[in-house]
Design a protein with these regions (language model features):
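Sec-dependent N-terminal signal peptides
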Residues: 4-13
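Terminal presequence/propeptide segments associated with secretion/organelle targeting
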Residues: 15-641
Length: 641
Protein backbone atom coordinates (compact mmCIF):
# COMPACT_ATOMS: atom_id res chain seq x y z
CA UNK A 1 0.00 0.00 0.00
CA UNK A 2 2.06 5.05 0.75
CA UNK A 3 9.88 17.35 3.93
CA UNK A 4 12.41 18.13 6.36
CA UNK A 5 14.18 21.52 5.69
CA UNK A 6 12.66 22.99 2.56
CA UNK A 7 9.21 22.89 1.05
CA UNK A 8 9.95 20.85 -2.05
CA UNK A 9 10.08 17.09 -2.27
CA UNK A 10 12.61 15.01 -4.07
CA UNK A 11 11.52 12.50 -6.62
CA UNK A 12 9.41 14.60 -8.93
CA UNK A 13 8.39 18.25 -8.96
CA UNK A 14 5.27 18.55 -6.85
CA UNK A 15 1.99 19.90 -8.08
CA UNK A 16 0.13 22.22 -5.74
CA UNK A 17 -2.46 19.55 -5.11
CA UNK A 18 -0.23 16.85 -3.64
CA UNK A 19 2.48 16.76 -0.99
CA UNK A 20 4.94 13.92 -1.47
CA UNK A 21 6.83 12.55 1.48
CA UNK A 22 6.90 9.91 4.19
CA UNK A 23 8.58 12.16 6.75
CA UNK A 24 10.45 10.78 9.74
CA UNK A 25 8.33 11.59 12.77
CA UNK A 26 11.27 12.74 14.91
CA UNK A 27 12.57 15.12 12.23
CA UNK A 28 9.60 17.50 12.00
CA UNK A 29 11.11 20.98 11.95
CA UNK A 30 9.93 24.55 11.56
CA UNK A 31 9.98 24.52 7.77
CA UNK A 32 7.86 21.38 7.57
CA UNK A 33 5.63 22.58 10.39
CA UNK A 34 5.03 25.82 8.48
CA UNK A 35 4.20 23.93 5.29
CA UNK A 36 1.69 21.73 7.12
CA UNK A 37 0.11 24.72 8.82
CA UNK A 38 -0.24 26.44 5.45
CA UNK A 39 -2.24 23.39 4.42
CA UNK A 40 -4.48 23.82 7.46
CA UNK A 41 -2.81 22.04 10.40
CA UNK A 42 -3.80 23.57 13.75
CA UNK A 43 -1.16 21.72 15.81
CA UNK A 44 2.50 22.45 16.39
CA UNK A 45 5.19 19.92 15.48
CA UNK A 46 5.72 19.38 19.21
CA UNK A 47 2.13 18.24 19.58
CA UNK A 48 2.73 15.54 16.97
CA UNK A 49 6.02 14.14 18.35
CA UNK A 50 7.95 15.09 21.46
CA UNK A 51 10.10 12.44 23.12
CA UNK A 52 10.59 14.71 26.13
CA UNK A 53 6.84 14.93 26.80
CA UNK A 54 5.77 11.27 26.83
CA UNK A 55 2.08 10.55 26.63
CA UNK A 56 1.12 13.96 25.29
CA UNK A 57 1.45 13.84 21.51
CA UNK A 58 -0.24 12.27 18.51
CA UNK A 59 2.61 9.81 17.96
CA UNK A 60 2.18 8.43 21.49
CA UNK A 61 -1.21 7.01 20.50
CA UNK A 62 -0.11 5.38 17.22
CA UNK A 63 1.31 1.86 17.44
CA UNK A 64 2.83 -0.72 15.16
CA UNK A 65 1.07 -4.06 14.95
CA UNK A 66 4.06 -6.33 14.62
CA UNK A 67 5.53 -4.01 11.95
CA UNK A 68 3.07 -5.22 9.34
CA UNK A 69 0.17 -2.83 10.06
CA UNK A 70 -0.60 0.29 12.08
CA UNK A 71 -3.20 0.85 14.80
CA UNK A 72 -4.14 3.67 17.14
CA UNK A 73 -5.30 3.94 20.74
CA UNK A 74 -8.77 5.49 20.86
CA UNK A 75 -9.80 5.16 24.51
CA UNK A 76 -8.28 5.46 27.98
CA UNK A 77 -8.62 1.69 28.38
CA UNK A 78 -6.23 0.60 25.66
CA UNK A 79 -8.79 0.14 22.87
CA UNK A 80 -7.09 -0.14 19.47
CA UNK A 81 -8.57 0.38 16.03
CA UNK A 82 -7.00 -0.88 12.82
CA UNK A 83 -8.10 -2.37 9.51
CA UNK A 84 -10.09 -5.57 9.23
CA UNK A 85 -7.56 -6.87 6.73
CA UNK A 86 -4.86 -6.43 9.39
CA UNK A 87 -6.94 -8.71 11.64
CA UNK A 88 -7.75 -11.14 8.81
CA UNK A 89 -5.25 -13.81 9.85
CA UNK A 90 -6.37 -13.65 13.49
CA UNK A 91 -10.00 -14.07 12.46
CA UNK A 92 -9.04 -16.90 10.10
CA UNK A 93 -7.06 -18.70 12.81
CA UNK A 94 -9.83 -18.31 15.41
CA UNK A 95 -12.58 -19.53 13.07
CA UNK A 96 -14.03 -23.02 13.20
CA UNK A 97 -16.79 -24.64 11.11
CA UNK A 98 -19.17 -23.86 14.00
CA UNK A 99 -17.92 -20.31 14.63
CA UNK A 100 -16.72 -18.65 11.45
CA UNK A 101 -15.55 -15.24 12.65
CA UNK A 102 -14.42 -14.27 9.15
CA UNK A 103 -17.80 -14.79 7.53
CA UNK A 104 -20.00 -13.90 10.51
CA UNK A 105 -17.88 -11.32 12.30
CA UNK A 106 -17.15 -11.23 16.02
CA UNK A 107 -18.25 -8.82 18.76
CA UNK A 108 -17.30 -8.99 22.42
CA UNK A 109 -20.41 -7.60 24.12
CA UNK A 110 -18.77 -8.11 27.50
CA UNK A 111 -15.17 -7.52 28.60
CA UNK A 112 -14.71 -11.20 29.43
CA UNK A 113 -15.53 -12.08 25.80
CA UNK A 114 -12.44 -10.31 24.44
CA UNK A 115 -10.31 -13.09 22.95
CA UNK A 116 -6.57 -13.37 23.82
CA UNK A 117 -4.34 -13.78 20.76
CA UNK A 118 -1.16 -15.81 20.60
CA UNK A 119 2.03 -14.15 19.40
CA UNK A 120 0.59 -10.68 18.82
CA UNK A 121 2.61 -7.63 19.87
CA UNK A 122 2.17 -3.88 19.67
CA UNK A 123 4.97 -1.32 19.77
CA UNK A 124 4.78 2.21 21.17
CA UNK A 125 7.53 4.51 19.89
CA UNK A 126 9.25 6.31 22.77
CA UNK A 127 12.24 8.00 21.15
CA UNK A 128 14.36 8.10 17.98
CA UNK A 129 18.11 8.72 18.21
CA UNK A 130 20.62 9.63 15.51
CA UNK A 131 23.41 7.10 16.08
CA UNK A 132 25.29 7.58 12.81
CA UNK A 133 28.54 8.55 14.55
CA UNK A 134 28.19 5.75 17.08
CA UNK A 135 27.75 3.15 14.34
CA UNK A 136 30.89 4.48 12.64
CA UNK A 137 32.81 4.30 15.94
CA UNK A 138 31.75 0.68 16.52
CA UNK A 139 32.75 -0.21 12.95
CA UNK A 140 36.16 1.45 13.43
CA UNK A 141 36.68 -0.41 16.71
CA UNK A 142 35.88 -3.77 15.14
CA UNK A 143 38.17 -3.02 12.22
CA UNK A 144 41.03 -2.03 14.55
CA UNK A 145 40.68 -5.37 16.35
CA UNK A 146 40.79 -7.21 13.04
CA UNK A 147 37.26 -8.58 13.40
CA UNK A 148 35.15 -9.40 10.39
CA UNK A 149 31.69 -7.87 10.58
CA UNK A 150 28.67 -6.94 8.55
CA UNK A 151 25.49 -4.97 9.05
CA UNK A 152 23.93 -7.71 11.19
CA UNK A 153 26.74 -7.56 13.75
CA UNK A 154 26.63 -3.76 13.90
CA UNK A 155 22.87 -3.90 14.35
CA UNK A 156 23.12 -6.49 17.11
CA UNK A 157 25.75 -4.50 19.04
CA UNK A 158 23.81 -1.23 18.95
CA UNK A 159 20.44 -2.81 19.70
CA UNK A 160 21.75 -4.80 22.67
CA UNK A 161 23.58 -1.76 24.01
CA UNK A 162 20.52 0.48 23.99
CA UNK A 163 18.14 -2.20 25.19
CA UNK A 164 20.39 -2.72 28.23
CA UNK A 165 20.62 1.03 28.88
CA UNK A 166 16.91 1.80 28.58
CA UNK A 167 14.99 -1.40 29.23
CA UNK A 168 13.16 -0.77 25.95
CA UNK A 169 13.06 -2.64 22.66
CA UNK A 170 15.71 -1.16 20.37
CA UNK A 171 15.67 -1.21 16.57
CA UNK A 172 18.51 0.13 14.42
CA UNK A 173 17.57 1.39 10.97
CA UNK A 174 19.84 2.33 8.09
CA UNK A 175 18.69 5.23 5.94
CA UNK A 176 19.96 6.03 2.44
CA UNK A 177 22.06 2.85 2.28
CA UNK A 178 24.06 3.71 5.39
CA UNK A 179 24.35 7.49 5.05
CA UNK A 180 22.43 7.83 8.31
CA UNK A 181 21.56 5.46 11.14
CA UNK A 182 18.64 5.99 13.50
CA UNK A 183 17.78 3.89 16.51
CA UNK A 184 14.14 3.65 17.60
CA UNK A 185 13.18 2.73 21.17
CA UNK A 186 9.85 1.03 21.80
CA UNK A 187 7.78 -0.15 24.72
CA UNK A 188 6.03 -3.39 23.83
CA UNK A 189 2.87 -5.15 24.95
CA UNK A 190 2.13 -8.80 24.24
CA UNK A 191 -1.31 -9.35 25.76
CA UNK A 192 -3.54 -8.25 22.89
CA UNK A 193 -7.18 -9.32 22.66
CA UNK A 194 -9.74 -9.24 19.89
CA UNK A 195 -12.70 -6.98 20.68
CA UNK A 196 -14.62 -6.96 17.44
CA UNK A 197 -14.68 -7.16 13.67
CA UNK A 198 -17.54 -7.01 11.15
CA UNK A 199 -18.27 -9.86 8.74
CA UNK A 200 -15.83 -9.94 5.86
CA UNK A 201 -18.71 -9.19 3.49
CA UNK A 202 -19.02 -5.74 5.12
CA UNK A 203 -15.32 -5.19 5.82
CA UNK A 204 -14.12 -6.23 2.37
CA UNK A 205 -17.22 -5.48 0.30
CA UNK A 206 -16.27 -5.64 -3.37
CA UNK A 207 -13.49 -8.08 -2.58
CA UNK A 208 -10.83 -8.80 -5.13
CA UNK A 209 -12.70 -6.96 -7.89
CA UNK A 210 -12.72 -3.62 -6.05
CA UNK A 211 -9.19 -3.93 -4.66
CA UNK A 212 -7.11 -0.85 -5.64
CA UNK A 213 -10.19 0.65 -7.30
CA UNK A 214 -12.20 3.79 -6.67
CA UNK A 215 -14.92 4.16 -5.57
CA UNK A 216 -14.86 1.55 -2.82
CA UNK A 217 -17.39 0.83 -0.07
CA UNK A 218 -15.53 -1.13 2.59
CA UNK A 219 -16.11 -1.19 6.34
CA UNK A 220 -12.45 -2.11 6.78
CA UNK A 221 -11.93 -1.92 10.54
CA UNK A 222 -11.34 -4.13 13.57
CA UNK A 223 -10.92 -3.52 17.29
CA UNK A 224 -8.32 -4.91 19.68
CA UNK A 225 -7.47 -4.10 23.28
CA UNK A 226 -4.08 -3.93 24.97
CA UNK A 227 -3.85 -5.60 28.36
CA UNK A 228 -1.11 -5.00 30.93
CA UNK A 229 -0.74 -7.51 33.77
CA UNK A 230 -4.18 -8.90 33.01
CA UNK A 231 -5.98 -5.55 33.03
CA UNK A 232 -6.85 -3.16 30.19
CA UNK A 233 -3.97 -0.76 29.62
CA UNK A 234 -4.60 2.60 31.25
CA UNK A 235 -3.95 5.05 28.42
CA UNK A 236 -4.93 8.60 29.40
CA UNK A 237 -3.46 9.89 26.14
CA UNK A 238 -5.38 8.62 23.16
CA UNK A 239 -6.69 9.93 19.87
CA UNK A 240 -10.04 11.67 19.86
CA UNK A 241 -12.66 10.75 17.28
CA UNK A 242 -14.34 13.44 15.21
CA UNK A 243 -17.96 13.12 14.13
CA UNK A 244 -17.85 16.55 12.48
CA UNK A 245 -16.75 15.22 9.10
CA UNK A 246 -14.71 17.01 6.45
CA UNK A 247 -14.97 18.67 3.06
CA UNK A 248 -12.89 18.46 -0.07
CA UNK A 249 -9.69 20.43 0.47
CA UNK A 250 -9.64 19.93 4.25
CA UNK A 251 -6.31 19.08 5.85
CA UNK A 252 -5.61 15.36 6.30
CA UNK A 253 -2.62 13.73 7.94
CA UNK A 254 -1.60 10.08 8.29
CA UNK A 255 0.78 8.81 10.97
CA UNK A 256 1.87 5.21 10.72
CA UNK A 257 4.49 2.61 9.90
CA UNK A 258 4.89 2.34 6.10
CA UNK A 259 6.71 -0.87 5.28
CA UNK A 260 8.96 -0.59 2.24
CA UNK A 261 9.49 1.76 -0.67
CA UNK A 262 12.29 1.82 -3.22
CA UNK A 263 12.22 5.39 -4.49
CA UNK A 264 16.02 5.52 -4.56
CA UNK A 265 16.05 2.64 -7.04
CA UNK A 266 17.80 3.17 -10.34
CA UNK A 267 16.20 3.30 -13.76
CA UNK A 268 17.97 0.01 -14.50
CA UNK A 269 16.32 -1.77 -11.58
CA UNK A 270 12.83 -0.45 -12.38
CA UNK A 271 13.26 -1.40 -16.04
CA UNK A 272 14.42 -4.89 -15.08
CA UNK A 273 11.55 -5.48 -12.65
CA UNK A 274 8.80 -4.31 -14.99
CA UNK A 275 10.22 -5.90 -18.13
CA UNK A 276 11.74 -9.16 -16.84
CA UNK A 277 10.63 -10.32 -13.40
CA UNK A 278 7.15 -8.91 -12.82
CA UNK A 279 5.60 -10.28 -16.06
CA UNK A 280 6.57 -13.80 -14.97
CA UNK A 281 5.37 -13.53 -11.39
CA UNK A 282 2.17 -11.71 -12.31
CA UNK A 283 1.16 -14.28 -14.92
CA UNK A 284 1.86 -17.27 -12.67
CA UNK A 285 0.14 -15.80 -9.63
CA UNK A 286 -2.84 -14.73 -11.70
CA UNK A 287 -3.34 -18.27 -12.98
CA UNK A 288 -2.89 -19.72 -9.47
CA UNK A 289 -5.57 -17.32 -8.24
CA UNK A 290 -7.98 -18.56 -10.91
CA UNK A 291 -7.38 -22.17 -9.84
CA UNK A 292 -8.12 -21.40 -6.20
CA UNK A 293 -11.00 -19.04 -6.99
CA UNK A 294 -12.72 -21.79 -9.00
CA UNK A 295 -12.74 -24.13 -6.02
CA UNK A 296 -13.59 -21.40 -3.48
CA UNK A 297 -16.65 -20.42 -5.50
CA UNK A 298 -17.72 -24.06 -5.78
CA UNK A 299 -17.26 -25.14 -2.17
CA UNK A 300 -17.58 -23.05 1.03
CA UNK A 301 -15.28 -25.52 2.80
CA UNK A 302 -12.50 -24.60 0.38
CA UNK A 303 -13.16 -20.91 0.94
CA UNK A 304 -12.80 -21.44 4.69
CA UNK A 305 -9.44 -23.13 4.20
CA UNK A 306 -7.96 -20.93 1.50
CA UNK A 307 -9.38 -17.43 1.97
CA UNK A 308 -6.38 -16.20 3.98
CA UNK A 309 -3.88 -17.57 1.46
CA UNK A 310 -5.91 -16.27 -1.47
CA UNK A 311 -6.24 -12.81 0.11
CA UNK A 312 -2.46 -12.46 0.46
CA UNK A 313 -1.77 -13.82 -3.02
CA UNK A 314 -4.32 -11.61 -4.77
CA UNK A 315 -3.26 -8.45 -2.96
CA UNK A 316 0.37 -8.80 -4.04
CA UNK A 317 -0.45 -9.97 -7.57
CA UNK A 318 -2.81 -7.09 -8.28
CA UNK A 319 -0.42 -4.56 -6.75
CA UNK A 320 2.53 -5.71 -8.84
CA UNK A 321 0.48 -5.99 -12.01
CA UNK A 322 -0.72 -2.42 -11.47
CA UNK A 323 2.83 -1.32 -10.74
CA UNK A 324 3.98 -2.48 -14.17
CA UNK A 325 1.13 -0.62 -15.86
CA UNK A 326 1.76 2.60 -13.91
CA UNK A 327 5.52 2.55 -14.51
CA UNK A 328 4.78 2.45 -18.23
CA UNK A 329 1.91 4.94 -18.16
CA UNK A 330 3.78 7.59 -16.17
CA UNK A 331 7.18 7.10 -17.81
CA UNK A 332 8.95 6.25 -14.56
CA UNK A 333 12.04 4.74 -16.19
CA UNK A 334 12.65 7.86 -18.29
CA UNK A 335 11.97 10.05 -15.25
CA UNK A 336 14.63 8.20 -13.27
CA UNK A 337 17.12 8.35 -16.14
CA UNK A 338 16.77 12.13 -16.13
CA UNK A 339 17.32 12.26 -12.35
CA UNK A 340 20.47 10.15 -12.43
CA UNK A 341 22.21 11.86 -15.35
CA UNK A 342 24.68 13.65 -13.04
CA UNK A 343 25.69 10.54 -11.09
CA UNK A 344 29.09 8.85 -11.56
CA UNK A 345 29.19 7.02 -14.88
CA UNK A 346 31.02 4.00 -13.46
CA UNK A 347 28.04 3.31 -11.17
CA UNK A 348 25.50 3.70 -13.97
CA UNK A 349 27.48 1.56 -16.38
CA UNK A 350 28.01 -1.06 -13.70
CA UNK A 351 24.29 -1.26 -13.03
CA UNK A 352 23.50 -1.48 -16.74
CA UNK A 353 25.98 -4.34 -17.16
CA UNK A 354 24.88 -6.24 -14.06
CA UNK A 355 21.17 -6.13 -14.82
CA UNK A 356 21.81 -7.22 -18.40
CA UNK A 357 23.90 -10.14 -17.10
CA UNK A 358 21.29 -11.47 -14.68
CA UNK A 359 18.17 -11.25 -16.85
CA UNK A 360 18.03 -14.90 -17.91
CA UNK A 361 19.06 -16.23 -14.50
CA UNK A 362 16.54 -14.11 -12.62
CA UNK A 363 13.75 -15.02 -15.03
CA UNK A 364 14.47 -18.71 -14.38
CA UNK A 365 14.62 -18.11 -10.63
CA UNK A 366 11.26 -16.36 -10.81
CA UNK A 367 9.74 -19.45 -12.42
CA UNK A 368 11.28 -21.62 -9.70
CA UNK A 369 10.05 -19.39 -6.85
CA UNK A 370 6.51 -19.02 -8.20
CA UNK A 371 6.03 -22.73 -8.91
CA UNK A 372 7.98 -24.99 -6.54
CA UNK A 373 8.41 -22.54 -3.63
CA UNK A 374 5.26 -20.39 -3.63
CA UNK A 375 2.97 -21.96 -6.19
CA UNK A 376 1.85 -24.90 -4.05
CA UNK A 377 0.45 -24.34 -0.60
CA UNK A 378 1.81 -27.70 0.53
CA UNK A 379 5.43 -26.65 -0.04
CA UNK A 380 6.03 -25.27 3.50
CA UNK A 381 4.81 -28.59 4.93
CA UNK A 382 7.19 -30.52 2.69
CA UNK A 383 10.11 -28.30 3.72
CA UNK A 384 9.35 -28.78 7.41
CA UNK A 385 9.12 -32.53 6.84
CA UNK A 386 12.51 -32.56 5.13
CA UNK A 387 14.06 -30.88 8.19
CA UNK A 388 12.47 -33.23 10.73
CA UNK A 389 15.00 -35.14 12.82
CA UNK A 390 13.08 -38.42 12.94
CA UNK A 391 10.57 -40.23 10.71
CA UNK A 392 8.03 -39.95 13.53
CA UNK A 393 8.43 -36.17 13.69
CA UNK A 394 8.17 -35.98 9.91
CA UNK A 395 4.94 -37.99 9.88
CA UNK A 396 3.47 -35.86 12.67
CA UNK A 397 4.11 -32.68 10.65
CA UNK A 398 2.25 -34.19 7.71
CA UNK A 399 -0.71 -35.34 9.81
CA UNK A 400 -0.95 -31.94 11.52
CA UNK A 401 -0.83 -29.87 8.32
CA UNK A 402 -2.77 -31.93 5.81
CA UNK A 403 -6.16 -31.14 7.35
CA UNK A 404 -5.77 -27.46 6.43
CA UNK A 405 -5.47 -28.34 2.74
CA UNK A 406 -7.91 -29.55 0.11
CA UNK A 407 -6.66 -32.35 -2.14
CA UNK A 408 -8.52 -31.08 -5.22
CA UNK A 409 -7.04 -27.61 -4.98
CA UNK A 410 -3.54 -28.84 -4.22
CA UNK A 411 -3.47 -31.31 -7.10
CA UNK A 412 -4.54 -28.57 -9.51
CA UNK A 413 -1.85 -26.23 -8.13
CA UNK A 414 0.78 -28.96 -8.32
CA UNK A 415 -0.17 -29.83 -11.93
CA UNK A 416 0.03 -26.18 -12.99
CA UNK A 417 3.35 -25.71 -11.19
CA UNK A 418 4.82 -28.80 -12.84
CA UNK A 419 3.88 -27.60 -16.31
CA UNK A 420 5.42 -24.16 -15.79
CA UNK A 421 8.47 -25.45 -13.93
CA UNK A 422 9.50 -28.03 -16.51
CA UNK A 423 8.61 -25.66 -19.32
CA UNK A 424 11.09 -23.01 -18.19
CA UNK A 425 13.83 -24.62 -16.07
CA UNK A 426 17.27 -25.22 -17.62
CA UNK A 427 18.51 -28.80 -17.52
CA UNK A 428 21.28 -28.11 -14.99
CA UNK A 429 18.72 -26.98 -12.39
CA UNK A 430 16.33 -29.94 -12.70
CA UNK A 431 17.29 -32.78 -10.36
CA UNK A 432 17.73 -36.36 -11.64
CA UNK A 433 14.67 -37.72 -9.79
CA UNK A 434 12.62 -34.80 -11.05
CA UNK A 435 13.73 -35.56 -14.58
CA UNK A 436 12.90 -39.26 -14.17
CA UNK A 437 9.36 -38.40 -13.08
CA UNK A 438 8.96 -35.99 -15.97
CA UNK A 439 9.95 -38.70 -18.44
CA UNK A 440 7.78 -41.33 -16.75
CA UNK A 441 4.63 -39.25 -17.09
CA UNK A 442 5.44 -37.84 -20.54
CA UNK A 443 3.96 -34.41 -19.86
CA UNK A 444 0.74 -35.66 -18.25
CA UNK A 445 0.93 -33.12 -15.46
CA UNK A 446 -2.39 -34.05 -13.86
CA UNK A 447 -1.35 -37.70 -13.57
CA UNK A 448 2.03 -36.67 -12.20
CA UNK A 449 0.33 -34.40 -9.65
CA UNK A 450 -1.92 -37.30 -8.55
CA UNK A 451 1.15 -39.49 -8.07
CA UNK A 452 3.01 -36.86 -6.04
CA UNK A 453 -0.02 -36.08 -3.87
CA UNK A 454 -0.58 -39.76 -3.12
CA UNK A 455 3.10 -40.21 -2.22
CA UNK A 456 4.08 -37.36 0.13
CA UNK A 457 7.66 -38.56 0.60
CA UNK A 458 8.15 -38.53 -3.17
CA UNK A 459 6.66 -35.03 -3.27
CA UNK A 460 9.00 -33.96 -0.45
CA UNK A 461 12.01 -35.23 -2.38
CA UNK A 462 10.78 -33.57 -5.57
CA UNK A 463 10.42 -30.16 -3.93
CA UNK A 464 13.79 -30.28 -2.18
CA UNK A 465 15.82 -31.64 -5.10
CA UNK A 466 16.16 -28.42 -7.11
CA UNK A 467 19.86 -27.78 -7.66
CA UNK A 468 20.14 -24.25 -6.28
CA UNK A 469 23.90 -24.55 -6.68
CA UNK A 470 23.39 -24.28 -10.44
CA UNK A 471 21.78 -20.87 -9.96
CA UNK A 472 24.52 -19.81 -7.57
CA UNK A 473 27.30 -20.95 -9.90
CA UNK A 474 26.04 -18.77 -12.74
CA UNK A 475 25.42 -15.81 -10.42
CA UNK A 476 29.05 -15.81 -9.26
CA UNK A 477 29.99 -14.18 -12.54
CA UNK A 478 27.57 -11.28 -12.26
CA UNK A 479 29.48 -9.17 -9.71
CA UNK A 480 28.16 -7.46 -6.62
CA UNK A 481 24.88 -5.87 -7.61
CA UNK A 482 23.99 -5.06 -4.00
CA UNK A 483 27.14 -2.97 -3.56
CA UNK A 484 26.41 -1.07 -6.77
CA UNK A 485 22.85 -0.38 -5.65
CA UNK A 486 24.10 0.98 -2.32
CA UNK A 487 26.66 3.18 -4.07
CA UNK A 488 23.90 4.46 -6.36
CA UNK A 489 21.64 5.35 -3.43
CA UNK A 490 24.40 7.23 -1.63
CA UNK A 491 25.43 9.03 -4.81
CA UNK A 492 21.84 10.09 -5.49
CA UNK A 493 21.50 11.27 -1.89
CA UNK A 494 24.63 13.45 -2.18
CA UNK A 495 23.61 14.75 -5.60
CA UNK A 496 20.28 15.94 -4.25
CA UNK A 497 21.87 17.31 -1.11
CA UNK A 498 24.25 19.40 -3.23
CA UNK A 499 21.30 20.71 -5.23
CA UNK A 500 19.41 21.73 -2.08
CA UNK A 501 16.63 19.19 -2.57
CA UNK A 502 14.88 18.15 0.62
CA UNK A 503 14.96 14.39 1.15
CA UNK A 504 13.16 11.77 3.17
CA UNK A 505 14.44 8.18 3.29
CA UNK A 506 12.66 5.19 1.83
CA UNK A 507 10.03 3.66 4.08
CA UNK A 508 11.40 0.90 6.30
CA UNK A 509 8.71 0.19 8.92
CA UNK A 510 9.66 3.21 11.02
CA UNK A 511 7.09 5.78 12.09
CA UNK A 512 6.40 8.37 9.39
CA UNK A 513 4.04 11.27 8.80
CA UNK A 514 2.43 12.24 5.52
CA UNK A 515 0.17 15.24 5.05
CA UNK A 516 -2.17 16.51 2.37
CA UNK A 517 -5.86 17.18 1.88
CA UNK A 518 -9.14 15.41 1.22
CA UNK A 519 -9.29 15.30 -2.57
CA UNK A 520 -11.15 13.94 -5.57
CA UNK A 521 -9.59 11.90 -8.36
CA UNK A 522 -9.41 12.44 -12.12
CA UNK A 523 -7.84 9.16 -13.29
CA UNK A 524 -8.16 9.95 -17.01
CA UNK A 525 -8.93 12.92 -19.19
CA UNK A 526 -12.55 14.07 -18.72
CA UNK A 527 -13.17 11.43 -16.02
CA UNK A 528 -13.97 12.85 -12.59
CA UNK A 529 -14.70 10.83 -9.43
CA UNK A 530 -15.91 12.24 -6.14
CA UNK A 531 -13.80 12.36 -3.00
CA UNK A 532 -16.26 10.17 -1.08
CA UNK A 533 -18.52 7.17 -1.62
CA UNK A 534 -21.94 6.63 -0.05
CA UNK A 535 -24.41 3.87 0.93
CA UNK A 536 -25.95 4.29 -2.50
CA UNK A 537 -22.91 2.55 -3.95
CA UNK A 538 -23.37 -0.38 -1.58
CA UNK A 539 -26.92 -0.83 -2.81
CA UNK A 540 -25.92 -0.47 -6.46
CA UNK A 541 -23.17 -3.09 -6.20
CA UNK A 542 -25.03 -5.44 -3.87
CA UNK A 543 -25.50 -8.91 -5.38
CA UNK A 544 -26.37 -11.76 -3.00
CA UNK A 545 -25.43 -14.31 -5.67
CA UNK A 546 -21.85 -13.05 -5.92
CA UNK A 547 -19.69 -13.66 -2.85
CA UNK A 548 -17.62 -10.47 -3.09
CA UNK A 549 -20.76 -8.31 -3.41
CA UNK A 550 -23.06 -10.10 -0.98
CA UNK A 551 -24.10 -8.52 2.33
CA UNK A 552 -26.06 -9.74 5.36
CA UNK A 553 -29.76 -9.13 4.76
CA UNK A 554 -30.19 -7.25 8.03
CA UNK A 555 -27.28 -4.98 7.11
CA UNK A 556 -28.87 -4.11 3.76
CA UNK A 557 -32.07 -3.18 5.58
CA UNK A 558 -30.15 -1.13 8.15
CA UNK A 559 -28.40 0.93 5.46
CA UNK A 560 -31.52 3.07 5.17
CA UNK A 561 -30.56 4.50 8.55
CA UNK A 562 -27.14 5.75 7.41
CA UNK A 563 -26.64 8.60 4.95
CA UNK A 564 -23.03 9.62 5.54
CA UNK A 565 -19.84 8.85 3.61
CA UNK A 566 -18.57 5.26 3.55
CA UNK A 567 -15.06 5.73 2.15
CA UNK A 568 -13.13 8.85 1.12
CA UNK A 569 -9.94 9.93 -0.63
CA UNK A 570 -6.95 11.98 0.46
CA UNK A 571 -3.68 12.65 -1.34
CA UNK A 572 -1.57 11.30 1.52
CA UNK A 573 1.60 9.44 0.54
CA UNK A 574 1.23 5.88 1.86
CA UNK A 575 2.30 2.32 1.18
CA UNK A 576 1.96 -1.16 2.68
CA UNK A 577 2.30 -1.03 6.47
CA UNK A 578 0.18 2.11 6.61
CA UNK A 579 -2.90 -0.12 6.68
CA UNK A 580 -4.90 0.79 9.76
CA UNK A 581 -3.18 4.17 10.15
CA UNK A 582 -5.38 6.90 11.60
CA UNK A 583 -6.34 9.63 9.16
CA UNK A 584 -6.34 12.84 11.20
CA UNK A 585 -7.88 16.25 10.69
CA UNK A 586 -6.24 19.61 11.38
CA UNK A 587 -6.75 19.17 15.13
CA UNK A 588 -5.28 15.66 15.23
CA UNK A 589 -8.67 13.95 15.55
CA UNK A 590 -9.51 10.68 13.81
CA UNK A 591 -11.70 11.09 10.73
CA UNK A 592 -10.93 7.70 9.20
CA UNK A 593 -8.53 4.82 8.68
CA UNK A 594 -6.22 4.35 5.69
CA UNK A 595 -6.79 0.97 4.06
CA UNK A 596 -5.84 1.06 0.38
CA UNK A 597 -4.40 2.99 -2.51
CA UNK A 598 -5.86 3.54 -5.96
CA UNK A 599 -4.65 1.66 -9.01
CA UNK A 600 -3.19 4.85 -10.51
CA UNK A 601 -0.81 5.02 -7.52
CA UNK A 602 0.66 1.55 -7.88
CA UNK A 603 4.06 2.79 -9.04
CA UNK A 604 4.38 4.75 -5.79
CA UNK A 605 6.86 2.34 -4.24
CA UNK A 606 9.38 3.56 -6.83
CA UNK A 607 7.98 6.98 -7.78
CA UNK A 608 5.35 9.37 -6.43
CA UNK A 609 2.93 10.67 -9.06
CA UNK A 610 1.26 13.96 -8.06
CA UNK A 611 -2.49 14.24 -8.71
CA UNK A 612 -2.81 10.46 -9.13
CA UNK A 613 -1.53 9.09 -5.82
CA UNK A 614 -4.49 8.68 -3.47
CA UNK A 615 -5.08 7.16 -0.06
CA UNK A 616 -8.40 5.30 0.27
CA UNK A 617 -9.90 5.62 3.75
CA UNK A 618 -12.90 4.31 5.66
CA UNK A 619 -14.90 7.12 7.27
CA UNK A 620 -14.90 6.90 11.07
CA UNK A 621 -18.59 7.86 11.12
CA UNK A 622 -19.39 4.73 9.08
CA UNK A 623 -17.41 2.71 11.62
CA UNK A 624 -19.31 4.30 14.51
CA UNK A 625 -22.65 3.71 12.78
CA UNK A 626 -21.84 0.00 12.38
CA UNK A 627 -20.87 -0.27 16.05
CA UNK A 628 -23.74 1.80 17.42
CA UNK A 629 -26.68 1.23 15.12
CA UNK A 630 -26.09 -2.04 13.29
CA UNK A 631 -24.29 -4.06 15.98
CA UNK A 632 -25.50 -2.28 19.11
CA UNK A 633 -22.11 -2.50 20.82
CA UNK A 634 -23.03 0.16 23.34
CA UNK A 635 -20.21 -0.49 25.82
CA UNK A 636 -17.62 0.35 23.16
CA UNK A 637 -19.51 3.38 21.89
CA UNK A 638 -19.71 4.72 25.46
CA UNK A 639 -16.00 4.04 25.94
CA UNK A 640 -15.22 6.20 22.91
CA UNK A 641 -17.17 9.09 24.39
Amino acid sequence: MKRLLLALALLVPLAASADEGMWMIHALNQALEKKMQERGLQLSAGEIYNADAPGATVSDAVVSLGFYCTASVISDEGLLITNHHCAYSDLFDLSTPEKNYLEDGYWAFFRQDEIPLQGKEVYFLKRVLDVTDEVAAVADSLTARGERFGSRKLTSILERRYAARTGLEASLNSMWAGEKYYLALYSTYKDIRLVGAPPVSIAAFGGDEDNWEWPQHKGDFALYRIYDHGEPLHSPWHLRISRAGYREGDYAMVVGYPGRTDRYSSSYKVDYLTRVERPVTNRLRGNQMEIVRKWMDADPAVRAKYSDWFFSLSNVQEMQEGEVQCVKRFGVVDEKRAQEKDLPQDILQGLADEYAAIEDIEREKAYYRETIVRGMRITPTMLRMSNAKTPEARDEIYRRDIGALDARVEKDLIAYSLEEYFGHMPADVVGPRQDSLRKAFSGDWKAMAEHLWDNPLVLMDFITEVKITAFNEREKHTGDLTDLQHRYTRALYHDREAKGIVQYPDANSTMRLTYGVVSSLEPWDAVYTSWYSSPRGLREKYNPAQHDFALPADFVAALDRYDGPVNFLTDNDITGGNSGSPVLNARGEVIGLAFDGNKESLASDVSFTPDYNKCVCVDIRYVLWILEDYVGLERIVKELK
